[in-house]
Amino acid sequence: MPTAAGHRHIADRILDALPDANFPFADVASDSEYYDAIEFMYRKGYMTGTSETQFSPDSALTKAVLVQALYGMAGSPEVNTDNLSFADLDSSNPAFKAAVWAVSNGIVKASDGKFEPDSEISVADFGLTMIRFSAKVDFNLKRVVKTVSMSFSLALENKFMIIKRSITRAQSAQKLAGYRYY
């Protein structure tokens, strides 16, 4: 005769197998290798979709999305936006505060008064940005060393084609979610 605990175990396994009704992205399969990372980044508010129902996991990560994720991971600190502006990023844009924060902290660069929010992030730039983030904002020697290791791992995974190849939104979600656990 099954026990209450046995019924609970079966019910839990059934619920685990069902897709999360509150997870909005139809293009992220619940059995994909990056589902947990994307769900984590979404639930924490670090990354959003490209629309209400699409995450676009295979699309390239943009500079605006990366700085928004890092800004959120840093706790969304207060930012003085009075002294910095960008010709290509309006102050009403949701990425503006994150861009000012990231440039002010030396995590990413802006040039000639432009932030280039839609520029694609290469694997190499992602690794360097994460090293800067680890060293300047979230300093912990162990984390910095692990971030350097993660960057090298990214280079290996991409067969050292890191200068031209863009990192995808799914790959970045995996690396950023993993970073939180270092």
Language model regions located:
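Extracellular/surface recognition and adhesion modules
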Residues: 38-41
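Histidine-centered active-site loop/cap adjacent to the catalytic His
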Residues: 1-21
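Feature responds to low-complexity, polar/acidic, surface-exposed segments characteristic
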Residues: 19-33, 48-67, 71-97, 104-170, ...
